[in-house]
């Protein structure tokens, strides 16, 4: 007789898991069959809400090893010495697709890393591109609505996509990247990752710098052409997920080098554009890459739901020595991500094994749905108190910085949406430009209103006249004389 007994969720042995309890062989099923009721009820509740963005994803465990001394820039403990290793979990994803969507579509890829440090978890929640479509979080719900399905037809709507982009010229840099060869990575292993936003590092003396993160793939950058990507999407929609899993399973561990760009605090006041604008990159001639360490992925998840689906990341998950910047998009994400996790996974999502800090969590938060640890036990549950409860550590406060201005709804004061998009276009080879234009033309052909196409062409033209002319020719449309 097997010692591996099937049990109910409350631990009692199950006598029959093949036949419902009925009144005779042909009689009705009995409500007293509590095992049947529990089994069906749990099945009805197996799904949690799908992520509103980045729903389709793959993940892996690994480690980060420091390869260069950066202690003069940050006091973060996990970066404190060369050779130090920190365990991590990463989740890659597409942005717009649903859980069952194809991997090889034209879409930015999420690149979210959770470091399990001795000072708590630290998340870098970025993409495989260094910029984004918008720079103020107030526009994010509208932007994502255009990327998702039309509420009337339940179909993707190219008119909505290009209408929004053409009315949001700050998107041009990211649109150019998306429509280029880089828009469809060959695999998750063959793409770079970026923190995208500007962050602040502070050292033990309280001295700060602005930084940007760059993860450079050691596998080399490889992309898919449109026809190959479409073929794979039809034959194996989980191609990227499968490739990552198989590579790690076969011992072919993917790795990335982490670099930072470092900007002195005072340069933010004089740089030629706002360094907190996530639609722009910092020139590497001005702020060269400095190596920090190496990330290696060497272990697959044991259970997709428990680890990849329930993993939660937020740019607000910070550790001492690393702070945020005034980037408006980043500031909105500080709220939105944690709030999304509270809705999707629950108020105590950070206590789940995949999200739980490796050091002791010590605070006065109590109760809430699915509180499954000791809930603080019998310890003091308020602060201040006279019973030896946990105390704040003033030395770990976020670094102070001066602010000024009038409280108002204010746009960014830099309106050059075209220089960097044009620079990127001119950096491309002739073949790369041809494919870029073909991708844009094919994506814009279904747009219903000609005025939307003309408006977008004008943006391309302002970035580079050749860029605009070639798109216009592909669509059979004129260039505005005043462009």
Swiss-Prot record:
Heme among keywords: yes
Active site: 54, 127
Record Gene3D superfamilies: Catalase core domain (2.40.180.10)
Cellular component GO terms, alphabetical: cytoplasm
Keyword Iron part of the UniProt annotation: yes
Reactions catalysed according to its record: 2 H2O2 = O2 + 2 H2O
Superkingdom of this protein's organism: Bacteria
Description of what induces expression: By hydrogen peroxide.
UniProt region (Disordered), positions on chain: 1-27, 372-397
This protein's UniProt keywords: Cytoplasm, Heme, Hydrogen peroxide, Iron, Metal-binding, Oxidoreductase, Peroxidase
Positions of heme binding: 337
EC number: 1.11.1.6
One function term, GO molecular function aspect: catalase activity
GO BP terms in the entry: hydrogen peroxide catabolic process; response to hydrogen peroxide
Broadest EC class assigned to this enzyme: oxidoreductase
Consequence of gene disruption: Insertion mutant shows increased sensitivity to H(2)0(2), reduced catalase expression and an absence of induced protection of the cell.
Location(s) in or outside the cell: Cytoplasm
Cross-referenced SUPFAM superfamilies: Heme-dependent catalase-like (SSF56634)
Compositional bias (Polar residues): 1-23
Known cofactor(s): heme
Family label: Belongs to the catalase family.
Function as written in the Swiss-Prot or TrEMBL entry: Decomposes hydrogen peroxide into water and oxygen; serves to protect cells from the toxic effects of hydrogen peroxide.
UniProt name for this protein: Vegetative catalase
UniProt organism field: Bacillus subtilis (strain 168)
